[in-house]
């Protein structure tokens, strides 16, 4: 990835393996997070977000949802995201942790991946809760202190759901092309 680029390529690396198999791959990151119909719009759609706006320089989405208690929203995140991800070999598909600031969620902010540090951006947009993939201990403490609930639903689980949407768009645009979504790509962690 661009955050940690390859210094050299060997037979164990995906580009070599793809070439040997005569396959190609499309790899997208931040541009797909911010794109219309991209990672965070798909994530917002899973939670039936209305009146959506962008935040975090266009990457995240914030909008209205049907009022729900934080524990129920966390459980819904676990169930809905699991339905959009490849199931692990063992353990739960999605592990969710949350901080409940003590008020129901009417306005939700979502940002996939490692978005926990963006809690202040979510607060500035009037969100009651930030749902992201990863948040560290200090993000959780600060968010709760400032009145924002926080749900960390896993990096993989918040990003993988977009693959079906991208595949559908490619199939519609290029009907002669066989478009496959990996059934092997899974969260690298095994959860207890």
Task: Place the predicted regions along the sequence by residue.
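Hydrophobic structural segments
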Residues: 1-192
């Amino acid at each position: 990835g661009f955050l940690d680029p390859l210094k050299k390529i060997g037979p164990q690396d995906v580009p070599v393996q793809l070439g040997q198999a005569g396959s190609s791959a499309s790899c997208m990151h931040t541009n797909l997070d911010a794109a219309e119909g991209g990672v965070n719009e798909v994530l917002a759609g899973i939670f039936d977000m209305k009146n959506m706006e962008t935040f975090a320089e266009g990457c995240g989405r914030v909008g209205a949802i049907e009022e729900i208690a934080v524990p129920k929203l966390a459980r819904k995140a676990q169930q809905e995201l699991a339905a959009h991800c490849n199931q692990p070999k063992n353990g739960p598909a999605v592990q969710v942790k949350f901080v409940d600031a003590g008020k129901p969620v009417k306005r939700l902010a979502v940002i996939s991946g490692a978005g926990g540090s963006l809690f202040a951006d979510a607060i500035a947009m009037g969100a009651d809760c930030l749902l992201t993939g990863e948040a560290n201990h200090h993000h959780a403490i600060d968010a709760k202190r400032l009145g924002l609930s926080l749900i960390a639903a896993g990096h993989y689980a918040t990003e993988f759901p977009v693959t079906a949407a991208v595949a559908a768009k490619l199939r519609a645009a290029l009907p002669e092309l066989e478009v496959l979504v990996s059934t092997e790509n899974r969260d690298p962690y095994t959860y207890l």
